[in-house]
Amino acid sequence: AGSLMTSTTADNLATALRLASSGFAVFPCQSGGPKAKQPMPFIKWREVSTTDQRQINLWWQKWPDAAIGLDLAKSNLIVIDADRHGEDDGVAAMGELMSERRYEPHGVPLAATPNEGTHFFYRQPEGKRLGNSKGALPAGVDVRGHGGYVIAPGTVMQDGRLYEVFGDIAEAPEM
C-alpha cells in the first residue's frame, strides 16, 4: 500500500451519515481492542440500527471513535466475506469460483478489509431473505445476509486501518 493514511476515526461519523442518507441502516461498533468489530455495549443492533441522522449523531457524540456496523437485513444487502486466515485463502477461492462460473464482478462494490480480506456487496434478490452461512462456499468464504452485519465500507479502525471501498451495488448472482 504505502499510501499516506489521512482518514481518522473522526471521519466515521460523516461516513455513517452518508450511508444512512443512502438508506443503509447503521449502528456503532468498537473500533479497537479485544472486542473490535463488536457492537458497542448495550447496543441491541438488530433493534436499534437506523438511518436516522439524529440518532447517529447522538451515538457518535457518545462514542466518537466508533466503527460503523452495517445491518444487512434493514439495508437489503448480502455480503460475501472472503478472508485470509492461515491456510484458507478465501480471496483466491472466490476468484476461482467466479472464473469457473464466468462471473465478472464488474461494478460489484468491494471493500478491502484491514486483514487483506474482501467484502463483496450485493442487493438481496427480489423477494428473498438470504441469511448467513458458513461452509457453503470454499474455506475462508462466508455469506452474511439477513440477521448479519459487517463493518461498513469506509470505516476507519482505531489503529488507522481502513475498510476501503470500490464500486456500486449489483444484485447477487446465482452461485
What residues fall within each predicted segment?
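Conserved phosphate/metal-binding and DNA-contacting active-site motifs used
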Residues: 1-175
